[in-house]
């Protein structure tokens, strides 16, 4: 297990949970940026996974931006009571916490 393994796993789970949230919110009105943040978070997690998998010298930078985007997504989805939004929120928070450890 390398130093990125846990972060990669949490990014993967966050990506899946954001995709699920996005699919469930498709076509529905949102009082905030929930669907938009899920799209951003999916892209950020994927980029972070790719950089860490390649042991890129930019992994810390990717992890920092991923944490910021995950925090935003957790805030947006956390405002909704839907189960998929709450799952997404928890996943985003866990991913952000681990990404911050990598970025430090």
Q: Where do the protein language model's features map onto the residues?
A:
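Amphipathic alpha-helical hairpins
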Residues: 1-104
């Amino acid at each position: 297990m390398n130093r990125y393994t846990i972060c990669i796993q949490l990014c993967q789970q966050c990506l899946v949970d954001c995709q699920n949230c996005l699919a469930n919110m498709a076509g529905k009105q949102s009082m905030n940026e929930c669907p938009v943040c899920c799209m951003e978070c999916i892209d950020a997690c994927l980029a972070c996974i790719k950089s860490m998998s390649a042991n890129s010298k930019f992994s810390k930078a990717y992890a920092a931006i991923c944490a910021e985007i995950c925090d935003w997504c957790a805030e947006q989805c956390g405002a909704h009571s839907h189960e998929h939004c709450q799952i997404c929120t928890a996943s985003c928070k866990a991913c952000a916490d681990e990404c911050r450890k990598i970025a430090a």
